[in-house]
Regions:
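Charged docking surfaces used in two-component/phosphorelay signaling
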Residues: 65-73, 211-219
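Short hydrophobic/Thr-rich beta-strand motif most characteristic of the beta2 strand and flanking loop
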Residues: 75-82, 90, 221-227
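C-terminal output helix
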Residues: 31-41, 86, 139-143, 155-168, ...
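The feature encodes the CheY-like receiver
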Residues: 106, 124, 136
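Hydrophobic/aromatic residues positioned on beta-strands within the core alpha/beta folds
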Residues: 4, 9, 131-132
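Active-site beta3 strand of CheY-like receiver
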Residues: 94-100, 105
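Acidic catalytic/metal-coordinating carboxylates
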Residues: 83, 109-115
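Conserved acidic carboxylate
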Residues: 10, 58, 204
Length: 227
């Protein structure tokens, strides 16, 4: 059911929480009949058969190729950008369904890109998955929590997680993926049932790890405490 677009009708303070868990869009309470009609029209337009658009923002050519090969299939069109400025230009030229963003870019930081996306009226709801190996400070961690939908830390199982996170925000149909990608996702989710409603304490002095682990565990149905 992850491919089904969910339209939230909620309070504004719940917006980021819902969007980070894959909600398609939201309408702020109290709403009007016109607001609900616009929301339904957005879902109707989004659900129409078409190839999804994904933008990969990464200055390293080998990393770009690796990400493109990992995520690519006939159901999506993948574009790439090497700089923050190029990424913003591309995003403003065509509507995109999801962005994979590295925080280390040659012309500006990934944080600046995220802030410009947030502040642009037509881009503010584009889901951005940060894919980075950068060690985060506490301040950077707090900024990411308010700007990005998800953070995937480069390392063990990061390809599976990146495929999983982008599939969620692109609303990709599991059965439509090639067998090797289905197997990657199945392996990642096989143990989820045992984790539902369990409480876990995450203790780490690296806020990057805390952010990444908390996001993954909460999405698996766990209650997360951090220290």
């Amino acid at each position: 059911t992850r491919h089904i677009p969910v339209q939230m009708v909620t309070l504004d303070e719940d917006r980021q929480h819902g969007l980070a868990r894959g909600a398609f869009s939201f309408v702020t309470k109290p709403t009007t009949s016109e607001g609900l009609e616009d929301a339904l029209n957005r879902i109707k337009e989004y659900a129409a058969p078409r190839r999804r658009r994904l933008l990969v923002v990464e200055d390293n050519a080998a990393e770009r190729m690796s990400i493109t090969e990992l995520l690519g299939h006939e159901d999506i069109d993948i574009s790439t950008a090497e700089t923050g400025a190029e990424a913003l230009t591309v995003l403003k030229s065509l509507p995109y369904d999801c962005v994979v963003l590295d925080l280390r870019l040659p012309d500006m930081s990934g944080f600046e890109v995220l802030e410009q996306i947030r502040d642009h009226e037509k881009l503010t709801d584009v889901p951005v998955v940060v894919f980075t190996g950068k060690e985060l400070t506490a301040e950077e961690d707090a900024r990411l929590r308010s700007l990005a939908r998800s953070v995937v830390v480069k390392g063990v199982e990061s390809p599976e997680r990146l495929l999983d996170e982008t599939s969620l925000f692109l609303h990709r149909v599991f059965d439509g993926l090639p067998p090797e990608k289905q197997n990657m996702l199945k392996k990642l989710h096989d143990s989820d049932e045992d984790l539902q409603n369990k409480q876990v304490l995450v203790v780490d002095d690296d806020t990057r790890n805390i952010f990444a682990l908390s996001s993954v565990l909460e999405r698996r149905g766990m209650r997360v405490l951090t220290a």
